[in-house]
């Protein structure tokens, strides 16, 4: 088998790009999808899954990769109610397996998913890109959230990880996460994984965690998957072939000290799904997302793809972010 090229699709009514549009992109076999109307902790019902999978199959694509089934905050915080939401998550896994899903991407980031300070930063050629300005990420999480949510309202769409229902409870969430140290978050991640691994084995679905984006603590919130050492810890903490990575070159290379190609070569057998994203770094620590051509950033796209090729990678890989 060889690697499969995927493309993320946000679904009818939430994505201006149609499946017919994606069909025009050479080599794309896999649609990476999700039920974007579902809140973390809710069960994905079989009828809802079937509706989207049928649309994808009718367009001539596979639908084996889901990005993402988000994890409820009670699980991350370690509240007594987490077991209820873990059971719901296990039922999602079972239901997805009935429709051929083999990989579930998820993350374990507290409160915020990906974080950027500018969603439309001018690149210089007339395009725009996501931008992270280090000095803007201080203690004022509300201003950043309001900025990103303004585009949710303007474009009538939901950004993954920035659901309005959750953002309306930011103060409550920060209070709930206050006692959660980095080690406690590791413990809660291990508890979650050990609880769902039997279901993953039963259903033949791999859980593929996305690294923290960016890979450092923000607003006093701990981040776990930030470098090669933390990835080693994650994979050995629950050493199961169904405990895997969604390796994101852009998230990892937001820290230029991370060698993504080396991580690929070390853990290729635990990477069923990969994101290829290029990053341009500034000397002051800011970064911008860039075009995927190797020379447009400092991520080392050629070396990363060579590593996947050399390792015989046979999972799904997709282009990630870039410019608009």
Residue ranges and their predicted role:
Residues 34-50, 219:
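Glycine-rich, proline-tolerant flexible connector loops at the mouths of alpha/beta enzymes
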Residues 15-21, 25-40:
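N-terminal ordered "arm"
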Residues 36-37, 70, 110-111, 214, ...:
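Conserved beta-strand edge residues that scaffold enzyme active sites
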Residues 1-6, 11-13, 20, 53-58, ...:
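Histidine-acidic metal/acid-base catalytic patches
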Residues 65-99, 103-123, 127, 134-145:
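Acidic/aromatic-lined carbohydrate-recognition and catalytic surfaces
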């Amino acid at each position: 088998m060889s690697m499969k090229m995927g493309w993320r699709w946000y679904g009818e009514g939430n994505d201006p790009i149609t499946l017919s549009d994606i069909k025009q992109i050479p080599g794309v076999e896999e649609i990476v999808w999700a039920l974007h109307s579902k809140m973390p902790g809710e069960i994905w019902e079989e009828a809802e899954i079937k509706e989207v999978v049928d649309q994808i199959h009718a367009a001539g694509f596979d639908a084996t990769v889901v990005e993402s089934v988000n994890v409820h905050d009670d699980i991350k915080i370690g509240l007594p109610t987490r077991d209820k939401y873990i059971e719901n998550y296990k039922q999602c896994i079972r239901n997805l397996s009935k429709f051929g899903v083999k990989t579930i991407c998820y993350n374990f980031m507290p409160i915020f998913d990906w974080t950027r300070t500018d969603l439309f930063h001018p690149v210089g050629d007339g395009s725009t890109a996501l931008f992270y300005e280090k000095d803007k990420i201080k203690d004022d999480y509300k201003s950043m959230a309001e900025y990103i949510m303004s585009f949710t309202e303007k474009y009538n769409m939901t950004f993954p990880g920035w659901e309005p229902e959750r953002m309306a409870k930011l103060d409550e969430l920060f209070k709930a996460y206050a006692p959660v140290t980095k080690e406690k978050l590791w413990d809660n991640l291990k508890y979650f994984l050990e609880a769902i691994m039997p279901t993953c084995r039963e259903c033949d679905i791999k859980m593929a965690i996305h690294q923290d984006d960016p890979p450092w603590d923000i607003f006093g919130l701990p981040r776990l998957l930030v470098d090669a050492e933390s990835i080693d810890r994650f994979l050995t903490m629950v050493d199961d072939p169904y405990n895997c990575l969604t390796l994101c070159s852009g998230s990892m290379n937001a820290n230029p000290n991370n060698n993504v190609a080396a991580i690929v070569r070390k853990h290729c057998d635990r990477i069923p799904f990969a994101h290829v994203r290029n990053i341009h770094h500034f000397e002051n620590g800011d970064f911008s997302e860039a075009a995927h051509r190797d020379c447009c950033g400092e991520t080392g796209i050629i070396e990363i793809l060579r590593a996947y090729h050399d390792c015989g990678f046979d999972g799904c890989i997709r282009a990630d972010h870039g410019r608009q």
